[in-house]
Amino acid sequence: MEKKDVFIFSISKLHYFDSLSSNMLYHKYANKIQQLQNNNTMENKISTILMQIENEGIGSFEEVLNNHKLANTMAVSVLVKDRDGKYALVLRTKNLAVGAGMLSVTVTGALDQNDYNCDNPVLACAKRELREELGIFYTICSQIEYIVISKSKLQPIFIINAEIADKWEDIICNFKNAKDYKNEVEEVLIVSLEDMKKLMQKYNMTDATFFHFQDVISRVE
């Protein structure tokens, strides 16, 4: 593309578990699925297979992103700061499929069918997740910085930094009224960059979240 700051990606409709099954089959894990039939729960099966994939390798970023045989659902990682430069981080509840009990950015989530009907599906997803998880209905600036792929999950994740015009202290009381707050959020932490560094040493997090934090910190050092 000759236009500056424009990129194109091809998309097609799929279901949530399509990505998991297609990636297993492509990487020849079908036999391992059969071996796990006696496990008690589907959760145990999936966890075991993901561990095997992580240990045995999944290929380079380019190999995963450019492989048209893989059904890679797209997601967003959104980190928001207020007008005082403070960031909202989230401790996730322990009942989530990804990132359970871990430290996270402000919101995360996968693009859904409604997002794809918007002019910019990625930013539409970011706005929806902010609204559903924390009741934040607007940002004054949202910037897509990178696309990353986790080592343990074949999912392209758009790294997004955003700002709001308010102070967190003025709106944090509204967070608990958000649609998905109870299911996804254990606690919201309002922190400076220095606090963020300390929390990175204290809590577990996904590698995508770690990358996002490190990138933001590196920009001011």
Please report, for each region that a protein language model flagged, where it lies by residue.
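N-terminal leader/linker segments that precede catalytic domains of diphosphate-processing enzymes
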Residues: 1-104, 110-128, 136-221
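Short alpha-helical functional segments enriched in proximate histidine and acidic residues
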Residues: 133
